[in-house]
Amino acid sequence: MPTLLNDKEVEYYLSKVKYPNCSPLTVTDGTIARNASQWDGQTGGAEIVKMLGHSMQAVSLPKGQSLSYRITTDKSGKAVLHTALIPTQPNDGGDLRFSVTIDDGQPVVFSLKEKFRSEGWKENVLRGQAVKTLQLDNITKGEHTITIKALDHHIIIDQWMLDFNPQRKHYLFPVVQSTQ
């Protein structure tokens, strides 16, 4: 049995499979998604960790430092911002906090700290990401800046996604791969 299908075989098998009410999650489907390594600005010390995370290039961010991303939305209204980080445990007994700021708004603080072997901890470890969600009641159409800041040590950011369909279920973020 061959390990790879040729184009004709792929076409044949795809024509036989039907997925009703299922549409692919794409960048143009009301989402903007990026790998953390695709930043537009950083305050210093950010290190790309190759082969780590869903992105395979997660970013270790020192305490007090931040990454910023400039985006342009073609929609306005309710949205959610999902931020995915590598699930880690503080080795100093502290917390694992980071903040997210949209434009000049108030920073929203999240904690990744989970009780060892709790359901949240298990889900994060099995997924390979700890995903935190920020509800946005009215994001406007146009240009915005998303800033993610490490408030504690051991913060490793993997990906983020802004989604104008807050109820959407997903597993992977529809990012365009970076060559960085």
Each model region followed by its residue ranges:
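Extracytoplasmic
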Residues: 1-180
